[in-house]
C-alpha cells in the first residue's frame, strides 16, 4: 500500500472576489486618456505617459478617486516583488476589493464577470487554498496564511532537492507545517 508514503498537497494560485457592474471606476471620467497609455483593466491597470508633467497631473487626480489606490512605480509595495521589473509602467492603479478599473463605462449591456482576482494579495479573499497530508506533515495542524512563493521551497525540501537560489520563497516560512 503506497498511501502511507505519499505526501499530497492541494493548492490554488489565488482566491477570488465578487465584482459588480455597479462598482466600476471609469478612468475616462476623471482623466484625459488621449495622452495616457492604459494597460489592462479589472482590479488594476498600469498607466504610462511620455510627458512627466501629464503623469504627475494624472497621479494627483487619481489619488482623489474613492475606491482607488494609485502608486508611482517606485512606491509600489516591496512585498509584491515586481516594482523593479522593466515591464512595470509609471503608475499602478489598484481598485479596492470588489471594484473594477475600466477606461470607459460601456453600460449595463456589456459583459462583466461576476468575480475576479488580482487585488492586493493581503486581502483574505485573495488567499489561495492550501491542504496537505502525508508523512512529513503535522496532523490536524492549521497554519497561518501561506504565501504561494513558499510552496516551491517546501516541495523541493520534501523531494530532497536543492531549490534554485534566485527565489523569494523561504522554507522557514512554512516549516511549521512539517513534523
Predicted feature residues:
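Glycine-centered flexibility sites
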Residues: 14-16, 115, 134, 160
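Acidic, His- and aromatic-enriched active-site or binding-groove loops in soluble protein domains
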Residues: 28-44
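…; additionally, a secondary subgroup of soluble metalloenzymes is captured
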Residues: 141, 150-179
